[in-house]
Structures are given as structure tokens and as C-alpha cells.
Amino acid sequence: MEKIIVSELTSFIAHAPTAFHTVAELKNLLNRDGFEELHESERWEIEPGKKYYVTRNNSSIIAVKVGTDLDDYSFHVTASHSDSPSFKLKENAEIEIAKRYTMLNTEGYGGMICSTWFDRPLSLAGKVMVKNGNRLETHLVKVDRDLLMIPSLAIHMDRKINEGRPLNKQVDMLPILSGSVKGPGAVKKLIAEELGVSEENIYGMDLFLYNRMEAVRWGHDDEFIGCPRLDDLQCAFTSMKGFLTAENNRNINVYACFDNEEVGSGTKQGAASTFLYDVLWRMNKALGKDEEEFRRAVASSFMLSCDNAHAVHPNYRQKSDETNCVYMNEGIVIKSHAGQKYTSDAVSVAIFKMICEKAEVPVQFFSNRSDEAGGSTLGNIAMSQVSMNTVDIGLPQLAMHSAYETAGVKDMEYMVKAVTEFYASNIRGDSDGNFRI
């Protein structure tokens, strides 16, 4: 099973260079499993026992499996994110240098490790709006060839280059497109050729750089995987596998994958939006349930906020908490933070531990050092719209936000097993703080 999951994950990531492509790949998985696509602008007809999904902005997706015995139901939700740190093309992106080079003007998206983007084959991918008569239609594009490079400055020209020189995204991080002057509109022309449309009919583009390097298994025992965008496509994929596998007729099982986590989630398609609430409420309404039943269901509901975690780095062990160290290939990570950057508390941790015990999956505990700010994720942000008990979990990895990250191969199977058990469980709240599982 381990080899199959790794192979499926690496294929998934290779086809998902942007959040738009991630959602397209998730849609493919759902379509093959018999899900019906819904549209937010249309009336929903929902039936017990059926499976549905809906997208927003082509970069966020929520899928739902409706049980058949919903007299006493709750929502079982997993939430991950579809985006990863990258560089986004600006409008009028072409820059001419010395009447020789054509560079591309970009800006940072998310908190990437800039140095890891040097000296790698890169290309462009994203979403393009194309005029077709009186319609504007969405097209996804992926330039599937080595198109760009951001070369390092030679050490002979900067003897302090290994001493932590700050990198300026406007100066140091611009990619080379060509060794000749291509002029304004070169990118639009290239994209038009890729899509087989006229340049004049391209009315908008959201284009990002992506790392072309393929995934590899490495280590003495092939125990690691190196790959772009493991944060958070590793969780997005493995939680989808569990979602598709599990059966439960007494719940409404929900899979959510949001965009824009890397830039704060505050968009119409981010975790801070009404997207999750809108879908849950409309599902409830279409099933003939009233507001009282909806509120009761939410009170018994549970969410797994799935986003990768920092494993102990062997070269920087002092960067990890003294008593809460996590390691690759040793189980799912439960993340906690006193300042509520993570949603985990005694209740949600206890519930998830019971689920993992049933699934025979090991767990680890992560906390930041008390003198390090650390990062945050989407769980507590989503709670501002629809509040339910939530635990923040993830898979341990190294080099988070690098252009090429590392994780353990065993942990993916652990996540699939735990998520499958979660979706198959029946979590019900008897009273505040008391649950049946």
C-alpha cells in the first residue's frame, strides 16, 4: 500500500502546479467515484445516500457524502489547502535588460524560502480568462517544458554570498525567459499558443511559477520523499483518499480544500470566507432540515484541520521544542499552541487520539519553542464562520516552504487510515465537553 500511495501522490502533485490545478485533480478523483458537481449559482437538489461537490474560484473545493440515516446526524469535516508559496506574474510582466535578456516581473506569493528557487528549471501555470462571444470562460494552463530559470550570482562576484545576504524579491528573484528581446506581450502570446486561442481573446491571467523538478524517493531505505508542494498537497491528497474510502450512513461527511492559506485565507475562496458555512447550510436546507437541526448538528460536528508540521531537523535540533519533538515516519502530528494559532484542546485531542487508537495509527505532539512565534494554519480561521470542535494535525516534514520539500513515506499511509476511521466514526456530543464516539 505504501508504494501505491507514494506513486499516486507524486502523480497528483506533478499534475497540480497551482491551486487551480489541484482542484482540477481533486475533481477528477471525485468524478471517477461518482460524485455530482453542484454550482453555487443554481438550486440544489440533494438526496440521502448521494455524493456531491462544489468549487469556488476554481481553486477551492468542498465535497460531501450524504448519509441515509440522518435522524441524529453531524458533519465530519477535513480541511486542507490547495496553495503553496510561489511567485506570481505581474501584469505587463516582460522586462528588457541590456537589449539582450527578457526577464519576468513577479511578486512573492506566501512565505517561500527564496534561495531554494535559484538554479532550478521553472515554468508557468495558472488560470486564464478567455472571451468566447459574449462569454468569459475559464481555462487552466500549464506550460509543460523548462521555460524559466533564476540563476544565482557567482560567488566570485559576491564573496559574502554564503553569509546570509538578504534577497530582494524585486531584484534578485526575477526569472529569465529569453536571451533575446521578446517585447511586451510575449507571455500572452506564449499562453495563447498553449491554449490555441487568439491573444486578443485573453482578458485575464493568474499565472505562477512552478518548480519542474520531479519527486524522488530517497534515503538508505527509501524512507523519504522529496517533492515540490508537499505542504499542503500531501494532506490534501491523503485526506481525500480517506474520504473516498470511508462509509458512514449516519453522518454528512465533508471534504474541504481551501485556497489562499499561505496568504492569510482572507479571500472569497479562503478558509475565512463563508464557503464552508454556505455549503453546510445549503445541504442541510436541501435535505429538509430546519435551523434548529442544523445548529444541533454543528454542535456535535468535528473537524480535522490538516496541514503539515515541522519535523526535527538533524542539523538544527535546537529549533524544536525540548519535549515535543516530532519525526518523519513516526506518525501523525497533533499541533497545539497556547495562543490559539492551532485549534487543538483537551477535548479535540482526546477525540482524535481515540480515533487513531481504533485505526492503530501512532500520533506525535508538536508545540513551538516558547521563544519562537511559529506559523499558523486554517483551522482557527474557519472557526470564525462555523464553529465546531477541531484538532490541528499534519504530517511531519523538513524544509517547509522550500521549492523542494522532504517528508516520510510511512506517514501517508497513517494519515489515510486515520482519516478513513474518522469519517467512519459517529461522534456525538451528549453535553458541553462530553462525547460518544
Label every PLM stretch briefly:
Residues 1-437:
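N-terminal hydrophobic/helix-forming segments and targeting peptides
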